[in-house]
Amino acid sequence: MGLTAIGDTLIASGHPGRTTAPELGSPNLGIIRSDDSARSWSPVSLTGEKDFHALAAGPDESLYGLASDSIELLRSDDTGQTWSPAGEVVAVNLAIDAAGQLFAATPDGLQVSADEGATFTTVNDAPLLYLLAASPDSKRLVGVGNGGQIWVRPASGAEWVPAGTTHGSAQAITITNGGDILVFDQSGLTALPR
């Protein structure tokens, strides 16, 4: 399942649950959105067709997604209504920084694209991450490595620094504009103040 936000709008994808409204799609949700803090959802596009495992929104409201059925990176400039191919990358997670650079957590290490996903290069000296997220203002990045180490890039171009560890495997992580980290792992939701 992928989840991201564009302003106050939540954009998500995945598989329907037992209580999911039929109009949201099956066997895949495609792109769905919520404008009321996830109280209700409506279909946007690719209903029943795609399951995006990774979604990321940029500061310019561009949206990138990796579907579970291919390595093709897709891009949308209209909050997910239409999609076009951007490039290819084998990744488990995506994030976009304030400069518009697209980061991909790949099995071979962190990669970055400065050309809207057309090409990717390896980020030297970056940790190997399986979770990756950007702060709402896109100035900070946070990630989790295979050993449970939490890493933060506090500003564009800055070095990655360790910021703590998870309790077992983590399923989700985020960072606030102020630098506070929220991680959901085997012990539940934990806040790591900066």
Over which residues does each language-model region extend?
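Blade-level signature of beta-propeller repeat domains, shared across WD40, Kelch, NHL, RCC1
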Residues: 169-194
